[in-house]
C-alpha cells in the first residue's frame, strides 16, 4: 500500500531487490530505500505479483543489507521536476545537478514516461533544420519533428559530430526559440569532460540541457536518462513552443543496460541475449519525437549508436532502423582517409528529406541537385572498384572525371572543419562547384533552367 514501509527484503542481486509480504504495489511505482546508516536511495517497481515486488535500485545495490534495509512504496510514478531554469544546466542520469549550481525549483513535475500521443493529433514533420554540416543538410536533410539516428562504430568521431550538431543546429527564417536537450549514457569521464567543455566554451550551454550518465554509474540509470531528457524536451516544446533537438548518445549502452537488467530478472533472452521486448522499449523512446497539431513546438531526435563490429544487421541498429526515419552512417574507410565527419552518403538516408527542402524551405534546386550529387558520387565509387581490376588506363575521359569528382566530393563536400558551420546556401553552391567537374551532358537529373541559373559557368557570366 502507498506509504507503507517494509523491512522484508529477501534477496538482492545485481541492481535488483526482492521485497516480500507487500500489498497494493503497482508496476512502475517509485520506491524509497533507506540503509542502516540513513542513506536514501530511489528505485522503481519492475514486477509485482501476489505479495512480492521486484525493485530496481537506481543508485545500485552496493552496501545494502537485506536485514537492515527498509523500503517504502510511495504510490507515485517516477517524475522529473521541470523548469525553464534547466536551460544552461548539467545534470546526472537521474536529474540531479552536477554543475555546482543550485537545485532546480520546479514549475511542475512530469512523469518520465510522458503522455502517449494520439496518432491523429500528430502533425506531419516538415521544415528544414540546418546543422551546418553539408553531408547532412545537402544530402540527408534533417526535418523538424523527425527521428534520424546516426549509425557509428567504435573509435569513430561520433562524439565530435554530436557536439558539433548540438552547437550549430538552428531553424532558418523564423524567430523560433531553439533548444538542445543532450543525453549521454554510459560515457567515460573523458567523454563527459569533452561534452561539458564543448558546450561551455562555445556558449551552446545557454540554450541546452545536459544529462550525463557515466560508465561507472549504475546501469539502471541508463534506462531512465533518455526518458528524463525527453520529458524535459516535451515540456520545452509543448509548454513553451520551442523547437527542441534531442541528441541521445550512445543508445548501444542503453540497450546493453536493458540486456543486463533482463538477465538479472532471468527473462528468456531474444536475439543475441537482448530481451524480446527491446523493439517495443526502443519505440517508447523514439516515438516521443514529433509535432502536435495546434502546438508550435516540436521535438526532433538524433539518437547515436555504435554498431558492434560495424554490423548494421546487429539487433540494435536493425530495430532502430524499423522505428526511425532513415539513418546517417559513419564510414571507417572515410575516417582512415582523414575525412571528418566521415559520413558515407550512399547508405545514409533521410526518409522525410523531400518534405523539408525545395522552394520556400531551402532552395528550389536542392532536391534535384542532391539527386545528381548522389548519382555522380555513386558512379565515381563504382569506377574505383573497376580501376582496381582493369587499371585507370582502360577508363574513358568521362570516367576519369567521375573519379576526380568522387575524390573532390569526399575532400571538399563531405569533409569540413569541426568548427565550420556552413549555411545551406554555401552547401548547395559547393555542390554546383563540384558538378562543374563533369560534362554538362552528364547532368541528367537537374532541369536545364537550374543549370543555367546555378552552374558556375553561367553564374559567373551573369555576374
UniProtKB/Swiss-Prot annotation:
What keywords are annotated for this sequence in UniProt? Answer: ATP synthesis, Cell membrane, Hydrogen ion transport, Ion transport, Membrane, Transport
Q: Which HAMAP family match?
A: ATP_synth_B_arch (MF_00310)
This protein is called what? A-type ATP synthase subunit B
> How does the UniProt record describe the way this protein sits in the membrane?
Peripheral membrane protein
Primary place of residence? membrane
Acyltransferase keyword on record: no
Which GO biological process annotations does it have?
proton motive force-driven plasma membrane ATP synthesis
Subunit structure as annotated in this protein's UniProt entry: Has multiple subunits with at least A(3), B(3), C, D, E, F, H, I and proteolipid K(x).
Provide a Gene Ontology MF annotation, just one.
ATP binding
Primary role: Component of the A-type ATP synthase that produces ATP from ADP in the presence of a proton gradient across the membrane. The B chain is a regulatory subunit.
PROSITE patterns found in the cross-reference section: ATPASE_ALPHA_BETA
Amino acid at each position: 500500500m502507498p506509504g507503507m514501509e517494509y523491512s522484508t527484503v529477501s534477496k538482492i542481486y545485481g541492481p535488483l531487490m526482492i521485497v516480500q509480504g507487500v500489498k497494493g504495489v503497482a508496476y512502475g511505482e517509485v520506491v524509497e530505500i533507506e540503509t542502516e546508516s540513513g542513506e536514501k536511495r530511489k528505485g522503481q517497481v519492475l514486477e509485482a505479483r501476489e505479495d512480492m515486488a521486484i525493485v530496481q535500485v537506481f543508485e545500485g545495490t552496493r552496501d545494502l543489507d537485506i536485514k537492515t534495509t527498509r523500503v517504502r512504496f510511495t504510490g507515485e510514478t517516477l517524475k522529473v521536476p521541470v523548469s525553464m531554469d534547466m536551460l544552461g544546466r548539467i545534470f546526472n542520469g537521474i536529474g540531479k545537478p552536477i554543475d555546482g549550481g543550485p537545485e532546480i525549483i520546479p514549475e511542475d513535475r512530469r512523469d518520465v514516461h510522458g503522455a502517449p500521443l494520439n496518432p491523429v493529433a500528430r502533425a506531419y514533420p516538415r521544415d528544414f533544420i540546418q546543422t551546418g554540416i553539408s553531408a547532412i543538410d545537402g544530402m540527408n536533410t534533417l526535418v523538424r519533428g523527425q527521428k534520424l539516428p546516426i549509425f557509428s562504430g567504435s573509435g569513430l568521431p561520433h562524439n565530435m559530430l554530436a557536439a558539433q550538431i548540438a552547437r550549430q543546429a538552428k531553424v532558418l527564417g523564423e524567430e523560433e526559440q531553439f533548444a538542445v536537450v543532450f543525453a549521454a549514457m554510459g560515457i567515460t569521464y573523458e567523454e563527459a569532460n569533452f561534452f561539458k567543455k564543448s558546450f561551455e566554451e562555445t556558449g551552446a550551454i545557454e540554450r541546452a540541457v545536459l544529462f550525463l550518465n557515466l560508465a561507472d554509474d549504475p546501469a539502471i540509470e541508463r534506462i531512465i536518462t533518455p526518458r528524463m531528457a525527453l520529458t524535459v524536451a516535451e515540456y520545452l516544446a509543448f509548454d513553451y513552443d520551442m523547437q527542441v533537438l534531442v541528441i541521445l548518445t550512445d543508445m548501444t549502452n542503453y540497450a546493453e543496460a536493458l540486456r543486463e537488467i533482463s538477465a538479472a530478472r532471468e527473462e528468456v533472452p531474444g536475439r543475441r541475449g537482448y530481451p524480446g521486448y527491446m523493439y517495443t522499449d526502443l519505440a517508447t523512446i523514439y516515438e516521443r519525437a514529433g509535432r502536435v497539431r495546434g502546438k508550435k513546438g516540436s521535438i526532433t531526435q538524433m539518437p547515436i549508436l555504435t554498431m558492434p563490429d560495424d554490423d548494421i544487421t546487429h539487433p540494435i541498429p536493425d530495430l532502430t532502423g524499423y522505428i526511425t526515419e532513415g539513418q546517417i552512417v559513419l564510414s571507417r574507410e572515410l575516417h582512415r582517409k582523414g575525412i571528418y565527419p566521415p559520413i558515407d552518403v550512399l547508405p545514409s538516408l533521410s526518409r522525410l528529406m523531400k518534405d523539408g527542402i525545395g522552394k520556400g524551405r531551402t532552395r528550389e534546386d536542392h532536391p534535384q541537385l542532391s539527386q545528381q550529387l548522389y548519382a555522380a558520387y555513386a558512379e565515381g565509387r563504382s569506377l574505383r572498384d573497376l580501376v582496381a581490376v582493369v587499371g585507370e588506363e582502360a577508363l574513358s575521359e568521362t570516367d576519369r572525371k567521375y573519379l576526380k569528382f568522387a575524390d573532390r566530393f569526399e575532400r571538399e563536400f563531405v569533409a569540413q572543419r569541426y568548427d565550420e558551420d556552413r549555411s545551406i546556401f554555401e552547401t548547395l553552391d559547393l555542390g554546383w562547384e563540384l558538378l562543374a567537374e563533369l560534362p554538362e551532358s552528364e547532368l541528367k537529373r537537374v532541369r536545364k533552367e537550374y543549370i543555367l541559373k546555378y552552374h558556375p559557368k553561367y553564374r559567373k557570366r551573369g555576374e
